[in-house]
Amino acid sequence: GDVVANPESVELK
């Protein structure tokens, strides 16, 4: 992921 706006990154925020 790259930013919180992506579903892949939403758990990594």
Curated annotation (Swiss-Prot):
It comes from the Eukaryota. This is Unknown protein 6. It comes from Ginkgo biloba. The lineage of its organism: Eukaryota, Viridiplantae, Streptophyta, Embryophyta, Tracheophyta.
